[in-house]
Amino acid sequence: MKLVIKYGAIIAACIGIWVLADHYLLHISQSESRLSLLTPVFFNLAQFIVLFLGLREKRSENRGVLTIGKGIATGLAISLSYAIFAGMFFVAFYLAVGSKMLENESTGFGNSQRDSHVLVGAFAGLFFGALFGGLLYSIVISFALRVRPTD
């Protein structure tokens, strides 16, 4: 359980630092920026790398054995803790910054949607995106790191 919380918190910290740096220093996530694609690339790369490190540690904890099922389950648990920690960060960030945080969010119909609808969509996207990405990355990493137990 410590491993799951540790690596989930590491991913969330990476994402939080990126968001703070982008919001206050870099400003690359603005819609007119050509570099706005860096944010989703960074989010996915951070999740993949930290999941790899977490699953590698899980394998070493189990005396060098990692089955595909254990790897996927651990990866999903790490991704769930990441989604929860990142959600808590964004709630705190929204409470501190307010609706200025939503300036870069696409709302689909101009700015006609209420902030609450945009927030629910953003949190759902973060939560389910983290879980879906975690599932895909865990499958790939588990196949790469798998070591069958010897009888």
Task: Provide a role label for each language-model segment.
Residues 1-58:
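Transmembrane alpha-helical insertion/packing segments
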Residues 2, 6-10, 39-43, 69-78, ...:
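Alpha-helical transmembrane segments of integral membrane proteins
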Residues 46-51, 130-140:
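Hydrophobic cores of alpha-helical transmembrane segments in multi-pass inner/ER membrane proteins
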Residues 52-71:
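Membrane-helix interface/capping segments
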Residues 66-74, 78, 140-151:
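Cytoplasmic juxtamembrane regions at transmembrane-helix boundaries
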Residues 75-93:
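Hydrophobic alpha-helical membrane-insertion segments
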Residues 88-111:
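Functional transmembrane-helix hotspots
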Residues 113-136:
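Hydrophobic alpha-helical transmembrane segments
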